[in-house]
From Swiss-Prot:
Bilayer-crossing regions: none
Practical and industrial applications: Azasperpyranones display potential anti-cancer activities. Azasperpyranones A, C, D, and F exhibit potent growth-inhibitory activity against the A549, HepG2, HCT-116, and HL-60 cell lines, with IC(50) values of 2.39-14.42 mm, respectively. Moreover, azasperpyranone D significantly inhibits HCT-116 xenograft tumor growth in BALB/c-nu mice. In addition, azasperpyranones A and C can bind with four kinds of therapeutic targets for cancer, eEF2K, FGFR, survivin, and TNF-a.
Gene disruption: observed consequences: Abolishes the production of azasperpyranone A.
Active-site annotation: S122 (charge relay system), D200 (charge relay system), H227 (charge relay system)
Induction: Expression is induced by the azasperpyranone cluster A-specific transcription factor ATEG_07666 which is itself regulated by the azasperpyranone transcriptional regulator ATEG_07667.
A GO CC annotation given for this chain: cytoplasm
Pfam family, one: FSH1
Protein's UniProt name: Probable esterase ATEG_07663
Entry's family note: Belongs to the LovG family.
Gene Ontology process terms (BP): secondary metabolite biosynthetic process
One GO MF term: hydrolase activity
Enzyme class: hydrolase
Length: 255
């Protein structure tokens, strides 16, 4: 089965972001790339001079997520990254296929920037953090000279950070680690920015994901909202400021 469609630039105009560093964006369960691109319209505007945001569709058909039909009822089909929210061992190959398809399509659209980060909401945030842990494991094995290849994303394992909107813990096992090591026994050490809505019913589970990350490399942005992507200027500005601060500290390298 072919991976579902991706979403990048959706018109034929010249795109000034093609040479910028790229951030792969993973939607929440029960939405899709097109919806997530719209939900991220304010953060995209804040970062438009610094990053190109590219939106991928999850591999699994899904019913619409909470409150999705009220605004986006005609924007289906809806997708998910996991076949069921309770899944602990995801279908890594299908996730990798969707990510690789979105990346390849963006290359064909003329984009040339390095893939420097991940950005996800809800289920997509959990998957994004888990992908970052997989990369960390792979890098640790490389340092130990064990030489390990782990699938479709082996050649694109240079993410520098992840922005995690309302992502739940614990981390998922995406592979690239010791067969006897579960992700809950490890801390994610690569830089993460956690965005929590203080009125979100799942807030404590989002704090679980924060606790899965090394304190010195995890940043927290809190805003007075529920389970959605913030769009108020002051809330989004706080997230964008954290991303720009990472860049100013050299986290993003030359990409």
């Amino acid at each position: 089965m072919s991976p579902p469609r991706f979403s990048g630039r959706q018109d034929g105009r010249t795109d000034p972001t093609t040479a910028l560093p790229r951030v792969l964006c993973l939607h929440g369960g029960g939405t899709n790339a097109r919806i997530f691109r719209t939900q991220c319209r304010v953060i995209r505007a804040h970062l438009a001079d610094s990053f190109r945001l590219v939106f991928a569709d999850g591999p699994f058909p899904s019913g619409p997520g909470p409150d999705v039909t009220a605004v986006y009822g005609d924007w289906g089909p809806f997708r998910a990254w996991l076949p069921h929210p309770a899944v602990k061992d995801p279908d890594v190959d299908k996730i990798d296929e969707c990510i690789a398809a979105a990346m390849a399509a963006d290359d064909r659209a003329g984009a040339t920037g390095a893939w420097v980060g991940l950005l996800g909401f809800s289920q997509g945030a959990r998957v994004a953090a888990s992908l970052l842990l997989r990369q960390q494991r792979h890098q640790q094995r490389q340092k130990a000279s064990l030489g390990f290849a782990y699938g479709a994303t082996n050649a694109i394992s240079e993410y520098r950070f992840a922005v995690l909107f309302a992502g739940r813990g614990p981390l998922l096992d995406m592979g690239a680690g010791d067969d006897n090591t579960r992700p809950e026994a490890e801390l994610l050490e690569l830089p993460t920015i956690h965005v929590h809505g203080l009125q979100d019913p799942g807030l404590e589970m989002h704090r679980d994901l924060l606790r899965c990350c090394l304190g010195s490399s995890a940043r927290l942005v809190q805003w007075d909202g529920d389970h959605r992507v913030p769009i108020r200027r002051k809330d989004v500005s706080a997230v964008a400021a954290e991303i720009r601060d990472l860049a100013s500290r050299g986290i993003l390298g030359d990409g």
